[in-house]
Amino acid sequence: MLWIFTEKMGKITAIAKGAKKSKSKLFSLTHPLCYGDYLLFKGKGLYRLSEGKIRTSFQTSLTDLEKLTYASYLCELIDISLQDEEENFNLYKEFITCLYLINTEAISYELLIRAFELKLLKYTGYGLRFDNCVFCKNKLSVSNYISLRYFGGVCDKCPKEHGLYINKATYNALRFLNNTSLDKVYRLTLTEEVKAELFKVTSFIISSVYSRKPKSLEMLKFIKE
């Protein structure tokens, strides 16, 4: 059984008969964290993998605990945020880009993951709003409070309920990561306090809005400690 995230069909489950045999033409196609072209046929229930070609393998992530944990977390986020066969091209593009960047070690994994989490929320209908107060809609240059119920910043005049107080530097970091392409987030330098607040905001929202809480978050906490 394979879990495949596709460009046009969303996430699907497929059968690869005989793929465990080393001489099978499907053997290399079924390795974890492979990006490629796959020929699938729809059976009575599941898809069946017929053949394919690997474009890029992220196998180096399998031998590095930190890389593997972050890559597994990305996969889990896709799994919990999308229904089967729910197309989401923007999220697919961000997912592949993030795997590439993790593999190259060009950007801090933690920074990269926070940016991906914000884009995941955006492309699944839970995007945070930073430019206007979520209550009165007045323009915001910065805020020290995020509403976790209404997904955005709150101005000084509106009630601070169902949310978190954060540093203004954290607010600006959230806005930057939300609006910046993944390959450009390296420009941001953060204090440990801001990193902790970013994690608190995104992890709370992700655990609240999707069908289940990502289990990989516990391993991420362990790595941070």
UniProtKB/Swiss-Prot annotation:
The keyword Nucleus does not apply. GO terms for biological process: DNA recombination; double-strand break repair. Pfam families: RecO_C (PF02565), RecO_N (PF11967). It comes from the Bacteria. One of its GO terms (cellular component) is bacterial nucleoid. Coiled coil: none annotated. Keywords: DNA damage, DNA recombination, DNA repair. Gene3D superfamilies: Nucleic acid-binding proteins, Recombination protein O, C-terminal domain. The keyword Secreted does not apply. Belongs to the RecO family. Involved in DNA repair and RecF pathway recombination. This is DNA repair protein RecO. The gene is recO.
